[in-house]
A protein has these predicted regions:
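Non-ligating segments of multi-cofactor redox enzymes
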Residues: 1-248, 254-278
Length: 278
């Protein structure tokens, strides 16, 4: 399998976004879908509380692992994410993540474009450990339920997709607005600004799902392979990579989202991305 056509990727991204948000009519009245499909996790980042959302939030499910005694759901959620990680790695980010598509569209806004300082990519691992695992455990109450710290204090997807639409639809919710909402609104605005300037800013800096899937890039079935005999060392693959990865030197980089831009740019047909089952 070779991935070279960026139009195909965009079609799949749009289809994944649409399937993740089937209940558009729920925006009218600010309802949240709570049907049987909410038992399943979206592989990408999409807020549970978004009125249109048809699947559960995987980050919320992970926080349930940390702060809940409901191990049946917890182990199911972990197993599902591990399955996606082993099968696809960060190809989930590049092909199936609704919030990832949003970031790419925002980046199209005309502006100066910046590169990301290398050290910033490690922030997402700190967020994963502290806000998805440590804080939910530390805040577990006497009923064995912890607070979803990432969702409550950081997640810009939740603010954009869930918080703002629900506040717009419900007067009683607007009366409860306090400092926490303004903090999350500031994080959302900073995220949007970052995504305008830097390609997939949130995905690369702060997304805990990106951290998890990135760690699994080296073992995932979806691989990037470089044929050393065909490679002419022209450097075009490195220049076109918006995630700032050098595919020749580091094909299993935790930052590679398997988008296929490098394969499309390679004049020697030396780069292949697909499922490596041997």
């Amino acid at each position: 399998m070779r991935i070279k056509n960026p139009v195909k990727r965009k079609i799949i991204q749009i289809a994944a976004f649409g399937f993740s948000n089937l209940h558009l009519l729920n925006f009218n009245g600010g309802k949240i879908y709570r049907g049987s499909w909410k038992q399943f996790c979206n592989p990408g980042l999409n807020c549970y509380s978004c009125p249109a959302a048809s699947l559960a939030c995987p980050v919320g499910a992970l926080q349930a692992v940390s702060g809940s005694m409901n191990f049946k759901f917890s182990f199911y959620a972990v197993g599902l994410l591990l399955a996606f990680g082993v099968a696809l790695g960060r190809a989930v980010c590049g092909w199936l993540c609704p919030f990832g598509l949003m970031q790419e569209l925002v980046h199209r806004i005309p502006s100066p474009k910046l590169k990301l300082k290398k050290g910033f990519v490690y922030i997402k691992y700190v967020i994963l450990v502290v806000f998805v695992f440590v804080l939910p455990v530390a805040a577990t109450n006497y009923m064995g339920m912890g607070k979803p710290a990432f969702c409550q204090y950081i997640c810009p997807a939740g603010t954009l997709e869930g918080g703002i639409p629900l506040l717009a639809a419900h007067e009683e919710l607007r009366q409860t607005i306090g400092p926490l909402f303004f903090l999350k609104l500031a994080i959302l605005l900073a995220t949007i600004a970052g995504c305008v300037l830097i390609y997939r800013f949130f995905c690369r800096v702060a997304c805990p799902l990106g951290a998890i899937y990135g760690l699994m890039n080296k073992i995932s079935v979806c691989r990037l392979r470089v044929d050393g005999q065909k490679c002419v060392s022209c450097g075009k693959c490195r220049k076109v990579c918006k995630m700032e990865v050098d595919p020749v030197k580091n094909p299993d980089s935790a930052e590679c989202i398997r988008c296929g831009a490098c394969a499309a740019a390679c004049p020697a047909d030396a780069i292949h991305i697909g499922f490596d089952i041997e």
